[in-house]
Amino acid sequence: MGSGAGELGRAERLPVLFLFLLSLFCPALCEQIRYRIPEEMPKGSVVGNLATDLGFSVQELPTRKLRVSSEKPYFTVSAESGELLVSSRLDREEICGKKPACALEFEAVAENPLNFYHVNVEIEDINDHTPKFTQNSFELQISESAQPGTRFILGSAHDADIGSNTLQNYQLSPSDHFSLINKEKSDGSKYPEMVLKTPLDREKQKSYHLTLTALDFGAPPLSSTAQIHVLVTDANDNAPVFSQDIYRVSLSENVYPGTTVLQVTATDQDEGVNAEITFSFSEASQITQFDLNSNTGEITVLNTLDFEEVKEYSIVLEARDGGGMIAQCTVEVEVIDENDNAPEVIFQSLPNLIMEDAELGTHIALLKVRDKDSRHNGEVTCKLEGDVPFKILTSSRNTYKLVTDAVLDREQNPEYNITVTARDRGKPPLSSSSSITLHIGDVNDNAPVFSQSSYIVHVAENNPPGASISQVSASDPDLGPNGQVSYCIIASDLEQRELSSYVSISAESGVVFAQRAFDHEQLRAFELTLQARDQGSPALSANVSLRVLVDDRNDNAPRVLYPALGPDGSALFDMVPRAAEPGYLVTKVVAVDADSGHNAWLSYHVLQASEPGLFSLGLRTGEVRTARALGDRDAVRQRLLVAVRDGGQPPLSATATLHLVFADSLQEVLPDITDRPDPSDLEAELQFYLVVALALISVLFLVAMILAIALRLRRSSSPASWSCFQPGLCVKSESVVPPNYSEGTLPYSYNLCVAHTGKTEFNFLKCNEQLSSGQDILCGDSSGALFPLCNSSELTSHQQAPPNTDWRFSQAQRPGTSGSQNGDDTGTWPNNQFDTEMLQAMILASASEAADGSSTLGGGAGTMGLSARYGPQFTLQHVPDYRQNVYIPGSNATLTNAAGKRDGKAPAGGNGNKKKSGKKEKK
């Protein structure tokens, strides 16, 4: 009695236990998650929260490792939120074609514990395709004897969308003779038929032009048009008639190209040409798998068929008689499936290794089998090949788990080749196999070993940032993470804060990258200590040294130190004695190169010379010497364009322009420089005369005379010429400075700026301070000022110091070709009118710049900015009375100079340059 009650109690508990277990596994095995989304959703769009729909919390996501298992990567699961995201383009027409329902089915895989979940995503159609005709225009030939009510089939349009988004209606442009009827085929597609409303008369009108419009009912609706050209012909009142409106035939997918599908027939009650029938595919049928004999109507297979791609074909045929009348029929071809596809085994997840102490039943891999065939040809079973300590468990439909079935021992078998064979139920059955190699993991007992004990690498400077400069490699005989080596930099002879800005190393590959462009001139070598570390626990490591040597490249062009450039970038002039003998040292081009080795070897070359053969240039020294004596036909001013090249490959170069003037004193050079007209003034003067000439021609002479007198009176009454006597002593017009020149050889150099003589207003200033010694004649940066600015409190326009009759240049102050050359120790103030005017123009131009406050020249007040060598005694107090010597350029005022009248001789030509023999050279 008691045993019976106990058995009865156990019997009652078994269904309860079964229902409990079923409630646990049924959500994973039975439920299917469904979503519905429109096609063409952007990549990254959210389909739904898969984790929430499966009952997972956000905290479980890292351990459950929820992911998608599908053949094509249409979707992915966000690891952070568990949302199902679109990962590739969803084109419903490409995925499902014309199917009314389109859905993507796949499995969602979750681990710990391992489960599969079926997900179904329905793709809704959107109106993203416009109806399109196969051609832009159609031509119809209609007999004039055609009766009203005769129908003519027109070319159809195609719309890849479905439902209301697909082609729904055709419209015909208004016509007195034609109307349009929308027809529907057996497959539901629409096609237009044009109906003749009134009889045609070819003698009245030979042709008609109509517009056919195809529309869909999408939102917004889309449409396209085609032109219909109707030609009216003579009578052909009977159209061809097919023996059947619809032909149906079944074909095996394995039939060979050339196999006859069927033969259609059509008759025409007309006679002669109007009864000759030709067959063709309709323009709406884009058929590439079949061929049609236009005369016999025989349809044959053109290309191989595939049930897995297309299961049936709907072909529209046309029969056209000689009069242009057309009849249509439909041929429906059903493709029969054959067992021509072997099953496939796909491993969804593959472990890198499994530890040898893994427990029985440990999950190793997930695999899925599939067969493209249908029915029993697509039913698949799978099994393991060979004697291996594993087994396969069925998880869900066509999904299996590979788990351990025995204790593993790495010392006996460090790895296993696991082969899974899938076989279908077709006749004959087809099968396929897939293999994986499973490694058995061990403990971390080997440290990484570098392939070399140390590394030395050469890197050319100016390398691109991010370039690879070296690669180190270390091997570890361990398996899995114990043998995975990562690299890092642990020490260097560079400062720690600068290390990351110089080099970095790839932790995976050991490739050392330059983070910046190296400069041989700043850093020639450095050393790194690299470490290779495995991923074991505890981790083992090894160190190695890497020495990087930075090689020099020709990346620095030569830099010309002498001659220096003026503010406008041109070279200053050098003065050469007129009697200079061949070999006379004129000047020397001095340049440097920041590179080293051959890249810093410099050579000097003449690129251009105004008088070839007059000068020679030292290839390595850069010395410019006279190659011959100055001839009578040689110009006084010469120009040399010199190139300085280094020895690099390719060589870099710099250029310098030398302006050489043959003269025995500075006074000879000044008139030649100052008298040159400004090109811009010449152009302005030319334009002025052209305007005056045109005015004289176009305007009456009397009016021109009145305007000229008025302009003359206005100019004579302008007080601008007295602007220099304003309290501020400011110049009204900015002085114009011609190009800079330098006079001198190696021991000395003159820098001279001369104000333009055509438009400058002169202000006479008196400066009481003396010029400080040791300052050279320099040119301003941009204003063209020559002389230093005097204190405004010391300027006056009413007093002028008397001339100093004992004004001299001392021997140390006299210009010459070298410091050792001798000359006359006496020098007088210029006594002729030209030199006096020239000197005053220089002084007044300097005063004008000083009044503007823009002069940047050195020198004390009253010294004209001359250096100590030429300037200490040359002060403004030696300038003759400006009321006697002033000369305003552009005027015809008579110039007076008491000294010039008193002594008509030219000033003494002091500092005449000597030849090498020591004799004086006459002008």
From Swiss-Prot:
It comes from Pan troglodytes (Chimpanzee). It is a single-pass type I membrane protein. It is found in: Cell membrane. Residues 797-832, 893-923 are annotated as: Disordered. It holds the Pfam family Cadherin. This is Protocadherin gamma-B4. PROSITE patterns: CADHERIN_1, CADHERIN_2. Gene3D superfamilies: Cadherins. The gene is PCDHGB4.
